[in-house]
Amino acid sequence: MTDDDRLESIVGAFRGRRVLVLADLVADEFVYGRVERISREAPVLILRHDATDVRLGGGANAVHNIRTLGGAPLPFGVVGRDEHGRRLRALLRERGIAATGVFDEAGYSTPVKSRVLAGRAHSTKQQIVRLDRYAPLAPRSPARRAVARALRSLRADVHGVLVSDYGCGLLDASLVRTAVAFARRRRVPVTVDSRFALLRFRGMTAVTPNEPEVEEALGITIGHDRRRLEAAGRTLLERLGCEAVLVTRGSDGMALFEPGRAPLHIPIHGTDEVADVTGAGDTVIATFTLALAAGATPAEAAQLANYAGGLVVMKHATATVSADELAAAIRGDTRR
């Protein structure tokens, strides 16, 4: 079996793999408008509203990617009793994703990231501003306790656990311990993508930070210095006690670190002239986790995540990748 055949067989094994996703669930809102003129009130554009689109964002985007890749995601999280919370539930339902692990809470506002995109008629719209609306979940949140109870009582077979932390307050230390203990009891991989608190997540199978998150966590600057990158990778392995660290590096590709192995540097798949990076990290961890759940080694999972990341950044807005697209990318890669 060639390397390509092996990777394709892993993609084929995605189907039906059940991945529990413990996540901050975010509504990604895209507001599109046509430029009409400059305002007389301030030096800003006046837009005529064309459309508003709401998509599954944050950890919900990882859930969506697992679904489109052929897996069976089990989302666990909290939304508000508000319009965006209802919209997220509806979007999950429309995609055939059960939301029995998603709880709502009065007084909590569903996190929303609103992006305003502007352009002339019949032209590609460009993002001009983003407005984030969220307040962290309360420390004694009843909905968080409900998530923990549901997690402890879950009896379904699960092949992997994905933790997505966007800093919205769901993932306190107790809930993280519950997730790690759940994965260990089931003897399945558990991965994490944390925007602001990477060093808080010890005992995971793997972490998938981007390079700026590594720099922020360790208080260093990597730039294009491979030696600094490799030193950072080794430091994270030691401090987090994990089996793999996958660092995403934008146009420089990815780097995988495992204890006792030489670093694996993976060049970017496709072009470095991207259309939109929104949610690319969600696609990467979804693919990486699903591959581990399907029996891939960390190196194989990283290769597949690199393909998926290269595909999704060529799409506009928060997007997903399918198993067919992933298999086609493997077959079409002339570098291998």
Regions found by a protein language model. Name each.
Residues 4, 10, 16-19, 27-162, ...:
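Conserved N-terminal subdomain of the carbohydrate kinase-like
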Residues 25, 166, 283:
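Active-site metal-binding loops of divalent metal-dependent hydrolases
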Residues 37-42, 204-213, 253-281, 327-335:
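Flexible glycine/proline-rich, aromatic-decorated loop/lid segments
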Residues 168-263:
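Conserved phosphate/ATP/ADP-binding segment of small-molecule kinases
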Residues 239-243, 269-333:
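Conserved post-catalytic alpha-helical subdomain immediately downstream of the catalytic base
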